[in-house]
Amino acid sequence: WDPAVARRSMDQALTKLNNNVQGVVSSNDGNAGAAVAALAEQGMAGKVPVSGLDCTVQALQLILLDQMTQSVWRDFDMMAEATAKATVALINEDSLDGIVMGTSPANSAGKEVPMVPVGFYNAVGEAGVQYVIDNDPSITKADVCKGEAAATSFCKG
């Protein structure tokens, strides 16, 4: 979860694999951005698919710059509501039926973990960036259209 560690790991992977990397799947956009930076140093940014999670402003900018393929956006209000319902049920020692909708695969301890699924959207290209801007009150077009991204057709239009 630390972009500095992710960058170091990506640099090491590129060295060990002689730049023979076919794609990067990252658990968050900070680490995806670090992977893009490492790829850029090797002249590979935009040539290797990179995916992230969270649809941060940086990720949306990298998508517009064709350096990141996609990021997954989740509605934080929906996540907060599901968390609040589960928390209240646990505090009141009530059933989680109707809140928990299954289990995740077994974790490293061999135990399945109750799961509360939350809807998501795969933000790809300009349409994906626009979707996030339209649906996430914490991100504006003005935020995204700064720096290098300001020169993209999305930001100029």
Indicate where each model-derived feature is located.
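Short, hydrophobic secondary-structure boundary micro-motifs
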Residues: 23, 71-72, 98-100
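Extracellular/periplasmic ligand-binding modules, especially the Venus flytrap/periplasmic-binding
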Residues: 28-36, 64, 74-95
